[in-house]
Amino acid sequence: MRIYWTITGSVFKIGVLIVLLGAIQSCRSRKPQSENAVWGEIENKLGIRIQQRSDLQFYKEVVKWLGTPYKYGGNSSQGIDCSGFVMTIYEVVFGRKLPRQSAQQHKESRPVTAKKLAPGDLYFFDIQGKGVSHVGMHLTDDYFIHASTKKGVIVSSLKETYYSKSFVGFGAFRLGD
C-alpha cells in the first residue's frame, strides 16, 4: 500500500510540474506586439499612412475615439464635440489643460506653419463665417482628426473643399509655449 501511494504521489507531482512548465512556456512565447505592428494597426484604423512615426501615445489615444458620436458640449465616449475632443486628448496625452472653446483655443495657441506641424497640433476653421468655430488635430500630411457634427470623431483632409474653404490656420500648444 505504501508503494502505491509513493508512486501515485510521484505521478501527481510530475503532472503538476508538466502543467507549470507548459504555463511558463506559453507566457514566454507571447511576445509583445512589435512597434511596426502597432503602427500598422493605427494606420488601418485611421485609414491613412503616417509618414513621421512619432508620438505613438497620441495616435493610440485618438484611435480609441474614432466613431464616438458628436454631442454639443460633450466630453465623454458617449458624445463629444470638437473642442472637448481636443481638450480631452491634450489633458490625457500631453498633460496640458486647454480652453474649452475652439475660438479660445485658437486665441491662446501659437501660430505654426504647415511645415512645422507636429502630431496633435491644431487646425482651426470658421465654418459659420463668424470666427473660429471648429478645431481638429494634426495626424500627418493634410489629415486631421476631429469631431464632426454629422459623423462624430472622424479623419478628414484639408484638401476637402468643405474644410479648405473654411480653414483659418494652424496652432500649437507644445511644451515651452
Give the predicted meaning of each segment.
Residues 2-14:
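Bacterial N-terminal signal peptides that target proteins for export
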Residues 22-26:
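C-terminal motif of bacterial Sec signal peptides marking the signal peptidase cleavage site
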Residues 28-40, 44-50, 96, 111-112, ...:
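Aromatic- and glycine-rich peptidoglycan recognition patches
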Residues 120-122, 142:
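Structural motif
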